Amino acid sequence: MFRGKIFVLSLFSIYVLSSAAEKNTSFSALFAFGDSVLDTGNNNFLLTLLKGNYWPYGLSFDYKFPTGRFGNGRVFTDIVAEGLQIKRLVPAYSKIRRISSEDLKTGVCFASGGSGIDDLTSRTLRVLSAGDQVKDFKDYLKKLRRVVKRKKKVKEIVSNAVFLISEGNNDLGYFVAPALLRLQSTTTYTSKMVVWTRKFLKDLYDLGARKFAVMGVMPVGCLPIHRASFGGVFGWCNFLLNRITEDFNMKLQKGLTSYAVEYDFKDAKFVYVDIYGTLMDLVKNPMAYGFTEAKKACCCMPNAIIPCFHPDKYVFYDFAHPSQKAYEVISKPIVYQIAKGLA
């Protein structure tokens, strides 16, 4: 059933994007916040073990060069930005990097691989927390003002930009780890995650953000790393972890619906991005989309130290990240959803 939904929405997205003007007129820029699903290289400049700037990452990227993206090529940030007719690549925003004026005006990425909406997750992995990313966005605004020179123009760019957010994947992954169990139930924790997400969105709103595309959590129980640790020789998904994920996603979706009518978020628009359902459809029906492997990773696992020859045939490139091809497939209905919901 979901497969048909992806197919129909893909046709709609092709029509919408092809019938639009050659240059995007709906969105001024795209800003990405969150974790490794969106990180385009910010962790390169951090003292953390979570990096994607070495072989075999980037094998399908331009010049086959690792950039810090956690995958074989472009990541979800890049693919959504291109689908929305903004630009093909979204650079990582690091305060020690020089970014062109054009990139400053059309969007950058603040996401950090390993980040969580729970500060403890980010501190444990020594990556940028949600609060750190907000601080970086404030710093970015100063640079944008120097480039644009007009406050009104800065406000227009930010208010008409898509704020793409992916948080929660690492929080839920580490919540079930015995060493990091909190003294609370999973339902209590997922409710707290929604509260933290609201604060994060409000911080961005107060800085001018108005168009939010907020991603749910992936089916983390079906990631290769959890299949290997939970599923044994059969490679089963961790159904418990998926249930916790579904609980959070349901609460997040309800929260976004309520935020849209709150005075605190006046004039803001929210789209819930169902990456759980779209990615799960690929996991359950890989051959329908041209994939031959949905359980194992192409690389970076004990049973796949050397990368596979055809990453486009794998749903997952490494232990926890979809391949570029998988991102391209699931992005089609999502781009249509964002374009329609935030226009």
Curated annotation (Swiss-Prot):
GO molecular function: lipase activity
Tissue: Flower buds and pollen.
A Pfam family the protein falls into: Lipase_GDSL
InterPro entries in UniProt: GDSL (IPR001087), GDSL_lipolytic_enzyme (IPR050592), Lipase_GDSL_AS (IPR008265), SGNH_hydro_sf (IPR036514), SGNH_plant_lipase-like (IPR035669)
Principal place of residence: secreted
Major enzyme class: hydrolase
A GO CC annotation given for this chain: extracellular region
An individual GO BP term: lipid catabolic process
Glycosylated residues (UniProt): N24
Traits of the deletion mutant: Reduced pollen fertility. Pollen grain exhibit a partial formation of coat and impaired water absorption and germination capacities.
Signal peptide limits: 1-21
Active site (catalytic residues): S36, D318, H321
Protein keywords: Extracellular matrix, Glycoprotein, Hydrolase, Lipid degradation, Lipid metabolism, Secreted, Signal
Enzyme Commission number(s): 3.1.1.-
Domain of life (superkingdom): Eukaryota
Subcellular location: Secreted, Extracellular space, Extracellular matrix, Pollen coat
Family membership noted in the UniProt record: Belongs to the 'GDSL' lipolytic enzyme family.
Biological role stated in the UniProt entry: Required for the formation of pollen coats and male fertility.
Protein name: GDSL esterase/lipase EXL6
The organism of origin for this protein: Arabidopsis thaliana (Mouse-ear cress)
Name of the gene this protein is made from: EXL6
